[in-house]
């Protein structure tokens, strides 16, 4: 685990999965954040939200740009591990019982149908639409009881950032077992409905944000404006932090 931009990242994909397996052998629950550019922007502006992001097990790097920034600043290689990738990896393993929370019921129904092709066990799993509420207003005790009755190991949450991360932090003290992972639009990507992830060639060339802008212009343009407005200060701060590091990061970590 390493800290960059004040966020605790786990870049080693194998260690991500090992950490999940270890956590599930112990009492209590925890959560993993899937940190993209929007989360990076929000943590820079909101220290309380930064504490939420770092209050879980760790973050995985959903942003394709953070690895570029780390190469520019530190000369190191770090892999991206997108939310849609960890979602596909865990669902296809057929290792855990899962529960899927959030999104509209239409999306959840289609998601269940599509995921069942990847993992037939999904047919017996719970897909639950959550009410449209402020994050303070959810019945966290009731949601925890539902999850524990379901005996889910992995709790997938799709409420959009920053709401879904705050949701996990508030649910954590009520939940006796499980690892929560908030994955935003990934439910939509895998549902087979309107919103899809960018083609692989765009992802490889750090152009996914362009695809997302055309898919959801009103939402994504606002996000991009926020990211661009804070990026110079964020990079400048990390350059300063580099000088204060006692140990230089290792050159490369395998994805």
Tell where the protein language model's regions lie, with residue ranges.
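N-terminal nucleotide/polyanion-binding subdomain common to many enzyme families
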Residues: 1-79, 84-85
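A short helix->loop->beta-strand "cap" motif at the edges of active sites that frequently abuts
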Residues: 29, 96, 175-179
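Short glycine-rich anion-binding loops that position phosphate/pyrophosphate groups of nucleotides
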Residues: 37-39, 159-164, 186-187
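Conserved beta-alpha
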Residues: 67-146, 150
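A transmembrane-helix-recognition feature enriched in membrane-embedded lipid enzymes
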Residues: 68, 197-252
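Short Gly/Thr/Asp-enriched flexible loops that form oxyanion-binding sites at enzyme active sites
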Residues: 112, 165-174
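Short, flexible loop segments at boundaries between secondary-structure elements
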Residues: 130-135, 176-213
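Proline-aspartate-enriched helix->loop->beta-strand connector
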Residues: 147, 151-156, 161, 177
